[in-house]
Amino acid sequence: MIRRLLIAPIRFYRYFLSPWVGRQCRFTPTCSAYAIEAIERHGAWRGLWLAARRIGRCHPWSPGGYDPVPPGHGAGAQACCAHRHRTEPD
């Protein structure tokens, strides 16, 4: 529920305000797409933190480029981690 409330103004910006302003983002995916994905993948608080950090890096002096949302703690994160973790000390 909170995720939807946080994503709604971002979608409003993407569909109604962004076409008037023009493409200003220096990153791929755009900051608004990054924010939506971060909130969906990491939840409200961590997603907002990641989105705020990304927006803070998006300025004219930034080199920009490809900057994906980091993997979450679910199955996607386990897929990128090939080694085993110990759960108990030996």
Swiss-Prot record:
Its main location: membrane. It comes from Bordetella pertussis (strain Tohama I / ATCC BAA-589 / NCTC 13251). Could be involved in insertion of integral membrane proteins into the membrane. This is Putative membrane protein insertion efficiency factor. NCBIfam families: membrane protein insertion efficiency factor YidD. It is a peripheral membrane protein. SMART domains: Haemolytic. Keywords: Cell inner membrane, Cell membrane, Membrane. The keyword Calcium does not apply. It is found in: Cell inner membrane. GO terms for cellular component: plasma membrane. PANTHER family: MEMBRANE PROTEIN INSERTION EFFICIENCY FACTOR-RELATED. Belongs to the UPF0161 family. InterPro entries: Membr_insert_effic_factor_YidD. The keyword Membrane applies.
